[in-house]
Amino acid sequence: MALMVVGLSHRTASLEVLERAAFDARGAEEVLRALTASPHVEEAFVLSTCNRVELYCDVSRFHGGVADIGDVLCRRIGRGLDELGDQLYVHYEDAGVEHLFKVACGLDSMAVGESQILGQLRLALRGLHERGLAGGTLDRLLQTALRVGKRAHSETRLDAAGASLVDTAMTRAAGVVGELPGRRALVVGAGAMSALVATTLARAGLDVVVANRTPDRAQRLAAAVGGRATGLDDLRAEVAAADLVVSCTGAVGHVLDVATVASALLDRPERPLFLADLALPRDVHPDVATLRGAHLVDLEGLGADLASSAVAQDLRAVRAIVAEEVAAHAASLRAADVAPTVVALRAQARHVVEVEMRRLASRVDLDDTTRSEVDRAVHRIVEKLLHTPTVRVKELAEAPGGVGYAAALRALFDLEVTAQGGALPGDAPLSGTVADAVGHVS
């Protein structure tokens, strides 16, 4: 079996496709049932966030896995593989592990360094346990990914990169509405990202209003930042009174449509309105950007600004952590892969000793004391002969390409070992698009 990741994100797919692919907990269960019912998928978990939809699977065959997983995702989106093949990516084995670790650290997020993804990974881990897959391949991988993500946040200044998305939005806003202190900001949503936004805006001296579908959550966040809470029923009036609006909810449809914003702008014909849409699927209808007086920026625009900033230099330490952890994970897998070979070698040695001791007993009349001494001596000799090669093969197996040593040991001693891994052909690419992988099949 081998890890395979098939998915799409803000880096490969349009926002329209990402919106169609996004799903809730019920949708995730449907996708998981479809995946595990396919012939080439043993285990699976789903990662669906504001800027990615990814299926992580333990597969028995590369080509079959690509076909099965790609088919499930395409049916979910409602598009054919011929349309989506270039937007869907595939990673497997070490490349899949590296991708997951980068995701866990926030390196692959639109909001670089954001830590909300760790919560999504915990949900995926809980789902594996609820389906009775604790202790399995993906369970161990997810636990490692969570540890890597926590390590990245604790050992580096990664959290500053997450806040920089909000800083970038504020810089854009100042260019539209002027100096920010004393301005009114409307924050739509009350989740983790909304809390970061509201806190940052309040510290910058803005008047903060928090609007949310659940009044209690809006009230708690507003109280924490010294702001005011409101429900979504008053959204039109709050937009009309605001200088800037930042929306980041988990809603499936648009929270701010063209009609609502257009109506709000009528009450403020001489004042520009800045809107930052930090949600995916979009909270703000993209056509709002066409309204006179409205200045809309979304995740794509902010991400482009962030990528060119000095924050990118602060992420090198995190990338080094990821590289180190990927290497350690690969070494542990290779060491685990050689273990059955070592067990088989020792079992074969024990069998040879037992056969020869029976043969000796049938030919030579030994008393119990002598037979016991001979038996112990033979076992000590065998153990000493096997000790160095078994220790060395474990050490060598941890190095890249070390699996070849286990294969050599099996060949030299004619050992019968249940195949470990072997899901993927040697000429298959480590990463690429699903379109490339399908072409590779043909």
From Swiss-Prot:
Pfam families reported for this sequence: GlutR_dimer, GlutR_N, Shikimate_DH
InterPro entries listed in its UniProt record: 4pyrrol_synth_GluRdtase, 4pyrrol_synth_GluRdtase_dimer, 4pyrrol_synth_GluRdtase_N, GluRdtase_CS, GluRdtase_dimer_dom_sf, GluRdtase_N_sf, NAD(P)-bd_dom_sf, Shikm_DH/Glu-tRNA_Rdtase
Biological process, per Gene Ontology: protoporphyrinogen IX biosynthetic process from glutamate
GO molecular function terms noted in the UniProt entry: glutamyl-tRNA reductase activity; NADP binding
Pathway: Porphyrin-containing compound metabolism; protoporphyrin-IX biosynthesis; 5-aminolevulinate from L-glutamyl-tRNA(Glu): step 1/2
Active site residues according to the UniProt entry: C50 (nucleophile)
Site, as annotated: Important for activity: H99
EC number: 1.2.1.70
Keyword NADP among record annotations: yes
Family assignment from sequence similarity: Belongs to the glutamyl-tRNA reductase family.
Role played: Catalyzes the NADPH-dependent reduction of glutamyl-tRNA(Glu) to glutamate 1-semialdehyde (GSA).
This protein's domain notes: Possesses an unusual extended V-shaped dimeric structure with each monomer consisting of three distinct domains arranged along a curved 'spinal' alpha-helix. The N-terminal catalytic domain specifically recognizes the glutamate moiety of the substrate. The second domain is the NADPH-binding domain, and the third C-terminal domain is responsible for dimerization.
Protein name in UniProt: Glutamyl-tRNA reductase
